[in-house]
């Protein structure tokens, strides 16, 4: 058989694998994606949602850098909804409910029509390693495929085990085979493997649900899209519905806990803390009875409904008994029962910030194999891994996004340096620079990285560069124009503001007043009809200028610590006085800067002072 040679191989066809494959191929590399089943490429295994606090920021950042998830969700969704509009700009986001069927079928179509990319259905059993460098893979069919770099985005399929009640069987997703040999191959090459667990709720037949007993929640006809390149006049407004558990639900759940695999001990691994099962909610909050339950249609092409909030791996009879106590679900028919899945993963402390393995050169990891949870988390890691695999194949330095530049950087930095006892989910609270890393300003802060990566077309880069110039020029103009007191007060009165000015003011300062919007300035100065994302940016940067400046000062301090480099072969045992726990963490992670060292669990300020003193 002819030798099969590629530049980048991607193992896995989920959200991480999709972004990695597209990134490598779009950068001109001959790439191959391996998937267990062609028909489940880009499958949304759990909820139909894209976005959420922190997650939406990841999607927006990928969009600016050249990723696909944002624009694909804009095209193939059932609704987009604005969240946290009453809060500050750091919290405002868009959340999408994707059409799960169209999302995956159209993504497969996109992949099949992407130049430089081949898609192959087969199970990868081994990685080929020579002299500490990855050389390719071996599949279940015994075929060897060679490549300069390999990206592993295996999801929940490494020794995956499905659990429903007291029933357990091997599968990476319900109805699909697991990959039983690959994690053993990784162990053979010095990579540590551990296990996590995640779970999903039952799916119901829409025709059996009484929606009249629930609150209907519609999306926005004219939303902020995930991608600023999306040109769409009107969006779908297919509703979701809200209901609640009751005291009877909790009573039944408590009776059924004896059958829960997390109580019986069948499941011993940890699941995502921020997406707990109903079993876990009842155990942790036994006195709370009204947990929210959202009913979300999975696709316009099916009658299947996702029951968000009722995640459980209890046996089928227990799932049905609990559902019967919820308003609107009294007669609901189950199409798929909820289940848990346990799987192997490789703790991300074994990676560089490029997502390349420290143990095997040219081997990259992305998504749940790194101990993360969520489509968006997997996708952004896949994108970065795919970009850096392509760059390594070209002999280029990796692209690194640090935690002051994006939530992508926060996620990667956290999973490498801060081990958690459960799958990692990105959250705004994990970032020190939330006001800087807003959902609405990814185009401002990541434009330089987008140019460096080189996936976006010259037309899109020009559009971004021009948009940034408009924002900066307009802010400077508004800060220079004065408006008389009488005219300014007339505008404030018209807008319902209680504030009264005692002298004239610059328009930039007037815009800082709560009730004043950029569009309302048309009464006192000439303004242009810029796209909404530009007007929003002008307004936010002026209104929150002092807070943004304070955060920028913190970022400068962070950057200075990042600039103090630590040699790659540095021997931390030479530094006297460092605590044992710090030394263990430093030797495991092998940080490349003082800033990175300071974020390792167990490393104190005193340890950093000793390290800095030694390096000087």
Describe each region flagged by the PLM:
Residues 4-16:
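Beta1/beta-strand and adjacent pyrophosphate-binding region of the FAD-binding site
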Residues 4-6, 140-149:
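Core beta-strand elements of the Rossmann-like FAD/NAD(P) dinucleotide-binding domain
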Residues 11, 144-155:
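Short hydrophobic core segments
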Residues 22-126, 141, 153-173, 177-183, ...:
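Conserved N-terminal/central alpha/beta ligand/cofactor-binding core
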Residues 39, 183-320, 328, 408, ...:
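An anion/pyrophosphate-binding glycine-rich loop and adjacent beta-alpha core
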Residues 128-144:
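Conserved beta-strand-loop-beta-strand element in the redox core of flavoprotein oxidoreductases
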Residues 306-372, 400-413, 531-585, 590:
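A glycine-rich dinucleotide-binding beta-alpha-beta segment and adjacent secondary-structure elements
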Residues 430, 447-452, 456-607, 613-615:
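Extended, charge-enriched "interface" segments that sit outside catalytic cores
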């Amino acid at each position: 058989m002819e030798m099969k040679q590629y530049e980048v191989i991607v193992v896995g066809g989920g959200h991480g694998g999709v972004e990695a494959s597209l990134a490598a191929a779009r950068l001109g590399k001959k790439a191959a994606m391996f998937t267990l089943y062609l028909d489940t490429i880009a499958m949304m295994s759990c909820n139909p949602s894209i976005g959420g606090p922190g997650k939406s920021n990841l999607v927006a950042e990928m969009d600016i850098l050249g990723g696909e998830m944002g624009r694909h969700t804009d095209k193939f969704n059932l609704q987009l909804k604005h969240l946290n509009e009453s809060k500050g700009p750091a919290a405002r986001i868009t959340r999408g409910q994707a059409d799960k069927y169209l999302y995956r079928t159209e993504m497969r179509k996109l992949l099949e029509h992407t130049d430089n990319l081949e898609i192959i259905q087969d199970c990868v059993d081994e990685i080929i390693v020579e002299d500490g460098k990855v050389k390719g893979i071996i599949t279940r069919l015994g075929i060897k495929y060679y490549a300069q770099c390999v990206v592993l985005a295996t999801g929940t399929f490494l020794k995956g085990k499905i659990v429903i009640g007291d029933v357990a069987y091997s599968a990476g997703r319900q109805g699909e085979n697991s990959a039983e040999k690959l994690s053993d191959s990784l162990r053979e090459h010095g990579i540590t493997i551990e296990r996590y667990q995640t779970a999903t709720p039952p799916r119901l037949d829409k025709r059996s649900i009484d929606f009249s007993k629930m609150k209907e929640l519609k999306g926005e006809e004219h939303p902020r899209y995930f991608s600023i390149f999306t040109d769409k006049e009107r969006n779908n407004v297919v509703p979701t519905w809200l209901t609640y558990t009751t005291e009877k639900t909790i009573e039944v759940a408590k009776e059924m806990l004896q059958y829960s695999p997390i109580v019986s001990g069948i499941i011993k691994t940890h699941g995502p803390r921020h997406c707990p099962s109903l079993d876990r909610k009842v155990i942790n909050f036994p006195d709370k009875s009204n947990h929210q339950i959202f009913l979300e249609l999975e696709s316009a092409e099916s009658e299947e409904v996702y029951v968000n909030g009722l995640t459980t791996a209890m046996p089928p009879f227990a799932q049905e008994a609990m559902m019967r106590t919820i308003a609107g679900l009294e007669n609901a028919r189950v199409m798929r029962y909820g289940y848990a899945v346990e799987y192997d993963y490789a703790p991300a402390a074994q990676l560089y910030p490029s997502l390349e393995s420290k143990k095997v050169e040219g081997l990259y990891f992305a998504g749940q194999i790194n101990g993360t949870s969520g489509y968006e988390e997997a996708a952004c890691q896949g994108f970065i891994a795919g970009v850096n695999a392509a760059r390594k194949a070209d002999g280029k330095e990796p692209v690194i996004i640090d935690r002051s530049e994006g939530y992508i950087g926060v996620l990667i930095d956290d999973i490498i340096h801060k081990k958690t006892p459960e799958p990692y989910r990105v959250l705004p609270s994990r970032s020190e620079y939330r006001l800087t890393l807003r959902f609405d300003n990814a185009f401002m802060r990541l434009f330089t990285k987008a140019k460096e990566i080189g996936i976006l077309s010259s037309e899109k880069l020009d559009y971004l560069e021009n948009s940034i110039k408009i924002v900066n020029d307009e802010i400077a103009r508004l800060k220079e124009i004065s408006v008389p007191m009488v005219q300014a007060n007339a505008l404030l009165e018209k807008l319902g503001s209680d504030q009264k000015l005692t002298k004239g003011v610059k328009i930039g300062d007037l815009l800082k007043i709560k009730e004043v919007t950029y569009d309302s300035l048309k009464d006192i100065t000439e303004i242009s009809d810029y796209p909404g994302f530009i007007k929003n940016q002008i307004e936010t940067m002026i209104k929150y200028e002092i807070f943004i400046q304070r955060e920028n000062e913190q970022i400068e301090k962070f950057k200075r610590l990042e600039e103090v480099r630590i040699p790659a072969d540095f021997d931390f045992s030479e530094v006297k006085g460092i605590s044992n726990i710090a030394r263990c963490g430093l030797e495991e992670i092998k940080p490349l800067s003082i800033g990175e060292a300071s974020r390792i669990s167990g490393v104190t300020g005193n340890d950093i002072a000793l390290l800095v003193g030694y390096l000087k």
